[in-house]
Amino acid sequence: RDLEALTEIAHKDFREAYRIFTDKNFATVIAEADPKQKALYAGLSKQPVTWQNLEEFLVATKQKAAVSISLKTTETEFYNVKETIQESFEIQRSGWGHLRLDIESKGGFLEPERKVVTDEEFIGSCLKLNYVIHADQLKSGNQIGEIIVRSPYQELRYQVTASKSPQIRIDIRREEK
């Protein structure tokens, strides 16, 4: 019952649940829990205790599901790039609880607006992540880069193709006689 109460509090106010989780008296509350839960708490309550520790505790004790993320689209293309462009893509979350995303890019021409995103930055279940395509960093031909979005449980990749040249389409059709 005590874990259920902590979960209810966390669902309404994660900050308050974190305060309870890190309070030295919580160890006496969890003393009645099964040995696995006590061992889990012992490991996750060691300093420094982060919000992620509370999230992992609730997930591991099956009090809640891990927050999951998805991308609305996974790739985009830009051709005839002559100057720096700012663009964005959408990250969607499902579930409740603490979420920290680490953002990195591969490809010298791509620069995400932020390196870290937290659940507080989502509007409802959506977040628009801005990024910049630096035209001066593009070489000849198509350049392919990625923006990598990592949570403790997932890694998603958003692929960006960019070129200074116009898009070339080759249309191969068989003529019927």
Q: Where do the protein language model's features map onto the residues?
A:
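Short, hydrophobic/aromatic beta-strand segments
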Residues: 86, 96-105, 142-144, 159
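Short beta-strand edge segments in extracellular beta-sheet folds
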Residues: 159-169
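Extracytoplasmic/secretory-pathway proteins
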Residues: 2-23, 28
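Surface-exposed binding patches on compact interaction domains or structured appendages
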Residues: 65-68, 72, 92-130
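A short beta-strand micro-motif common to beta-rich folds, especially ectodomain repeats
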Residues: 89, 129-131, 139-153
